[in-house]
């Protein structure tokens, strides 16, 4: 697809002055800037075209090449080519024109932004009780902190960083390659725009030093494995006074010997005697708040699940509380004496001679087996 004439794009004549080109660009850039067009793709493309045209016509050498060769001057590995080279980003070269309108724009001619310190992660192992109830604890974190003697500047006390004489504080320099200009990070100041002549001896000019910090962390009630607690600004300090990163406390809840947690519900198994299962009765079941009584109805079968509402975990994100699910497991008696064994045999004989069915699962099992073989015969 053919590209529009750069002069036509900016709406200026071929003999327009640098001031006229700049004025036209500023007007169009403000009109079509993505911050004002709310995601309108067609206006985004127009903005790219306007920016590309300005980058060519505002540079004397590029403008002369364009006047002589047209768009062909910037194809085949040149400074842009193909329509996307000059407009492939927003705000890379117009911070000096209207950066005050859009909060600094981004500007390849402006100093690079300070690099904030790295985020850190600290792993915490908690018991289920501490996770459910919450806990305050102290942690020790090896990190970088701002250097106190130089107040994070990196410069010796009583001195300050000076504007870089190579890039004049911009952080970038232009390298000429024939007709084209390429911006690169300033090799003198590494893109910071300033250089430190007299470095702080404590931090060697970095503005930060290694230290182990002791921090107080409040673990909220209801946390679970995988939850993170963010401590803003407690990560590594940035170099030369740059903002610090954040510290993330990563929670891991250890397995419990009695309870298994599923979201805000707790599950446990409670052993009961076969007498209690048959005749019913009250038993004690454990909860995280202590033991509570549970009424077991007669003829309860092993595996029966009982729900104790509100005895689970209070949600860390809402006011709801989960339940405690208790599964009863009927224990087979062991270490029986001879008399006890005889009593069980007598009970079994009496139950076998009774006309009533006393083993619902056993009866159901044999009925199922009989039906299976009857089906095979048919």
Swiss-Prot record:
Any one GO CC term of the record? cytoplasm
Question: Organism's domain of life?
Answer: Bacteria
Give residues annotated as binding Zn(2+) 2. 164, 167, 186, 189
UniProt domain J: residue ranges: 5-70
Residues in CR-type zinc fingers: 134-212
InterPro entries linked: DnaJ (IPR012724), DnaJ_C (IPR002939), DnaJ_domain (IPR001623), DnaJ_domain_CS (IPR018253), HSP40/DnaJ_pept-bd (IPR008971), HSP_DnaJ_Cys-rich_dom (IPR001305), HSP_DnaJ_Cys-rich_dom_sf (IPR036410), J_dom_sf (IPR036869)
BP GO terms, sorted? chaperone cofactor-dependent protein refolding; DNA replication; protein refolding; response to heat
Q: How is the cofactor bound?
A: Binds 2 Zn(2+) ions per monomer.
At which positions is Zn(2+) 1 bound? Answer: 147, 150, 200, 203
Query: Does the record carry Chaperone as a key word?
Result: yes
Q: What are the entry keywords?
A: Chaperone, Cytoplasm, DNA replication, Metal-binding, Repeat, Stress response, Zinc, Zinc-finger
Q: Where in the cell is it found?
A: Cytoplasm
Molecular function per GO:
ATP binding; heat shock protein binding; unfolded protein binding; zinc ion binding
Q: Which cofactor is essential here? A: Zn(2+)
Q: What is its main location?
A: cytoplasm
The record, for SUPFAM superfamilies, names: Chaperone J-domain, DnaJ/Hsp40 cysteine-rich domain, HSP40/DnaJ peptide-binding domain
What are the CXXCXGXG motif repeat spans here? 147-154, 164-171, 186-193, 200-207
Family stated for the protein in its record: Belongs to the DnaJ family.
What this protein is reported to do is described as: Participates actively in the response to hyperosmotic and heat shock by preventing the aggregation of stress-denatured proteins and by disaggregating proteins, also in an autonomous, DnaK-independent fashion. Unfolded proteins bind initially to DnaJ; upon interaction with the DnaJ-bound protein, DnaK hydrolyzes its bound ATP, resulting in the formation of a stable complex. GrpE releases ADP from DnaK; ATP binding to DnaK triggers the release of the substrate protein, thus completing the reaction cycle.
The entry describes its oligomerization and partners as: Homodimer.
HAMAP family given for it?
A: DnaJ
How are the domains described in the entry?
A: The J domain is necessary and sufficient to stimulate DnaK ATPase activity. Zinc center 1 plays an important role in the autonomous, DnaK-independent chaperone activity of DnaJ. Zinc center 2 is essential for interaction with DnaK and for DnaJ activity.
Q: What is this protein called?
A: Chaperone protein DnaJ
């Amino acid at each position: 697809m053919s590209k529009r004439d750069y002069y036509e794009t900016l709406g200026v004549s071929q003999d327009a002055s640098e001031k006229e080109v700049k004025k036209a660009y500023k007007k169009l850039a403000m009109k079509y800037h993505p911050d004002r067009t709310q995601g309108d793709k067609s206006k985004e493309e127009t903005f790219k075209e306007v920016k590309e045209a300005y980058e060519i016509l505002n540079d004397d050498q590029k403008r002369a090449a364009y006047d002589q060769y047209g768009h062909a001057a910037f194809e085949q590995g040149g400074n842009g080519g193909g329509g996307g080279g000059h407009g492939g980003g927003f705000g890379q070269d117009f911070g000096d024109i209207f950066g005050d309108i859009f909060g600094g724009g981004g500007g390849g001619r402006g100093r690079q932004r300070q690099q904030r310190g790295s985020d850190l992660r600290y792993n915490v192992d908690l018991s289920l009780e501490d996770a459910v109830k919450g806990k305050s604890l102290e942690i020790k974190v090896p990190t970088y902190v701002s250097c106190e003697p130089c107040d994070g500047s990196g410069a010796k006390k009583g001195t300050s960083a000076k504007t870089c004489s190579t890039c004049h504080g911009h952080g970038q320099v232009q390298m000429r390659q024939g007709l084209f200009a390429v911006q690169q990070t300033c090799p003198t100041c590494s893109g910071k725009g300033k250089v430190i002549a007299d470095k702080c001896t404590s931090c060697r000019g970095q503005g930060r030093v290694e230290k182990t910090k002791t921090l107080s962390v409040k673990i909220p009630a209801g946390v679970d494995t995988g939850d993170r607690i963010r401590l803003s600004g407690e990560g590594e300090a940035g170099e030369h006074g740059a903002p610090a990163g954040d510290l993330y406390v990563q929670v891991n809840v250890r397995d419990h010997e009695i309870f298994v947690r599923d979201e805000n519900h707790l599950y446990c198994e409670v052993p009961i005697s076969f007498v209690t299962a048959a005749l019913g009765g009250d038993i004690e079941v454990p909860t995280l708040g202590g033991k509570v009584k549970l009424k077991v109805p007669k003829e309860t079968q092993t595996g029966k699940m009982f729900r104790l509402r509100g005895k689970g975990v209070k949600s860390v994100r809402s006011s709801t509380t989960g339940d405690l699910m208790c599964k009863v497991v009927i224990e087979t008696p062991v270490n029986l004496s001879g008399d006890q064994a005889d009593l069980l045999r007598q009970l079994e004989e009496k139950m076998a001679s009774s006309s009533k069915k006393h083993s619902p699962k056993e009866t159901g099992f044999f009925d199922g087996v009989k039906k299976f073989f009857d089906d095979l015969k048919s």
